[in-house]
Amino acid sequence: MTIFALSSGPGVSGVAIIRISGPESSKVIKSLTSKEIPVPRMATLRKINNINTSELIDEGIILWFPGPESYTGEDMAEIHIHGGKAVILSLQNEISKIDNC
């Protein structure tokens, strides 16, 4: 099972971080960006889209941490997005559509 959560804390902020950990982490990033996984540990700017409509959700920074050399020991990704509630909820909704997340 792949898990995801807001790791930057609740409330209004300029930037929010969604952390994803587990075997489907790479699938999540590929599905949201329609691009390959970025170079490990290198911040990469990407457009983050609705999986079904390709509508832009936000433009954010993706960080990829392959396991076992990650914070959790599993494949892991961080998505740094704008901190508004609508953006956060939209991204969490899209991730939840992916099998095993």
Question: Model-found features: residue ranges?
Answer:
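A glycine-rich (often HGG/GG-containing) alpha/beta subdomain
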Residues: 1-101
